């Protein structure tokens, strides 16, 4: 019988079909530790689940992981529900997770702690960014459910404390999957309106699941970005949500939020009354001081003898005018003198004057130079004549005029001794008026007496 060989693809698909048709492998509950966690840009999660002795690849697609509240991390122990299948490209089996929650810690509690740490690290809880709640808000916006005790408590408290204030209610869902987007949209709408001085965002008490919308990241970031100051009022006094940490001010209850947003009109009236009394008292004191000053002025010389005072002032004015005229004349004289001095200085230092002085100096120098040059030439001329006379006395030509001559060999060297030539050598004899070409036919040596 001939053997049939399977392809790798065929074998892998066969194994995959066997696994996927096994009902025990289509609804598997596992617990393990996350490692090699990767969050794909498309939202899918890829990681490994492991225990002390084994490991399995895990995939959680975006459609399923968007429902989990916490962020999976390496080292986290989790409980998962999914189905087993084979990834044909690698031939490996893996679990496709449909639900996941932390092992030992509540899903919502872990998500709360993770988001709290992350937002705090980003600075969203910092006091630096907290806006001041206005003390006398004219218009108060309320973002909460249109039904329930919270809205009634807020409106009742505001109207009781501050009946002249305006209240604008932005009805929203406060629990369920659509609650967070509803709250975010209401905050944006309020910020787009004009005239709202402060916002109250909150709801009545409830379980962590019921209050969860106020722990959503989108709500926290919307509160942080709000240009209008926000007072959070979520649940009871012991309930703390992420919104409470981000808000500009936290109120323990909705009623307390209304008291923080709206001033007490009775207290305001008391303040106005006290300030009115202080103002009236200050005005009475001011009027009394002015009356006393008026009485003093009425008793003064100016009030009793106004004509004399007028005449005195008129006389003072005349004198002041005279002094002004004299001062003006002195000032003009002073400036005229300064102008004359400047004119004299300018005339003295005028360029034409300077040129004339320079021209005279140059002419003087030229004459001096000519005299010195003439003297120098005369001195040089006298020295030249003396040198010429001395040179003439020492000149060989002068000696030649007395019958002497100079004898040269063929190389035109002056012969100083008979030893410098031989018989038959050609020599030249230079006389005063010419040169003789001669030949040596005889040599007669003489002894020099005393070297002469």
Curated annotation (Swiss-Prot):
InterPro entries named among the record's database cross-references: Exonuc_VII_L, Exonuc_VII_lsu_C, OB-fold_nuc-bd_dom
Signal peptide bounds: none
MF-aspect GO terms: exodeoxyribonuclease VII activity; nucleic acid binding
One Pfam match: tRNA_anti_2
GO BP, sorted A to Z: DNA catabolic process
NCBIfam families listed in its UniProt record: xseA (TIGR00237)
Subunit structure: Heterooligomer composed of large and small subunits.
Protein role: Bidirectionally degrades single-stranded DNA into large acid-insoluble oligonucleotides, which are then degraded further into small acid-soluble oligonucleotides.
Entry protein name: Exodeoxyribonuclease 7 large subunit
Species of origin: Bacillus cereus (strain AH187)
Lineage, opening ranks: Bacteria, Bacillati, Bacillota, Bacilli, Bacillales
């Amino acid at each position: 019988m001939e053997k049939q060989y399977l392809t790798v693809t065929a074998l892998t698909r066969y194994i995959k079909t066997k696994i996927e048709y096994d009902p025990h492998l289509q609804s598997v509950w596992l617990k393990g530790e996350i490692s090699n966690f990767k969050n794909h840009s498309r939202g899918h999660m890829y990681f490994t689940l492991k225990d002390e002795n084994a490991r399995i690849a895990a995939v959680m697609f975006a459609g399923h992981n968007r429902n989990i509240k916490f962020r999976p991390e390496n080292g986290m122990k989790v409980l998962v529900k999914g189905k087993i299948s084979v990834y044909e490209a690698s031939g490996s089996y893996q679990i496709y997770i449909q639900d996941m929650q932390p092992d030992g810690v509540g899903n919502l509690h872990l998500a709360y702690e993770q988001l709290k740490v992350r937002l705090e690290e980003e600075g969203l809880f910092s006091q630096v960014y907290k806006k001041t709640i206005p003390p006398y808000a004219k218009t108060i916006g309320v973002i909460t459910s249109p039904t329930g005790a919270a809205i009634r408590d807020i409106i009742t408290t505001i109207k009781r404390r501050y009946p002249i204030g305006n209240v604008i209610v932005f009805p929203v869902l406060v629990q369920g999957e659509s609650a967070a987007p509803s709250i975010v949209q209401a905050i944006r709408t309020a910020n787009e309106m004009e005239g709202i001085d402060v916002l109250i965002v909150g709801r009545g008490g409830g379980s962590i699941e019921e209050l969860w919308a106020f722990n959503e990241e989108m709500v926290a970031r919307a509160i942080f970005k709000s240009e209008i100051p926000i007072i959070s009022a979520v649940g009871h006094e012991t309930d703390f949500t992420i919104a409470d940490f981000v808000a500009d001010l936290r109120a323990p209850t909705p009623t307390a939020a209304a008291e923080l947003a709206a001033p007490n009109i009775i207290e305001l009236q008391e303040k106005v009354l006290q300030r009115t009394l202080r103002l009236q008292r200050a005005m009475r004191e001011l009027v009394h001081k002015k009356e006393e000053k008026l009485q003093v002025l009425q008793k003064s010389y100016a009030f009793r003898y106004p004509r004399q005072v007028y005449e005195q002032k008129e006389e003072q004015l005349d004198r002041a005018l005279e002094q002004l005229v004299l001062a003006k004349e002195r000032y003009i004289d002073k400036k005229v003198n300064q102008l004359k001095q400047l004119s004299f200085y300018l005339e003295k230092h005028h360029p034409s004057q300077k040129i004339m002085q320079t021209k005279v100096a140059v002419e003087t120098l030229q004459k001096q130079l000519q005299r010195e040059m003439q003297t120098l030439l005369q001195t040089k001329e006298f020295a030249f004549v003396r040198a010429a006379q001395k040179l003439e006395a020492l000149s060989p030509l002068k000696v030649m005029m007395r019958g002497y001559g100079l004898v040269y060999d063929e190389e035109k060297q002056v012969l100083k001794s008979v030893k410098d030539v031989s018989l038959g050598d050609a020599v030249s004899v230079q006389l005063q008026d010419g040169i003789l070409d001669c030949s040596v036919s005889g040599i007669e040596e003489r002894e020099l007496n005393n070297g002469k």
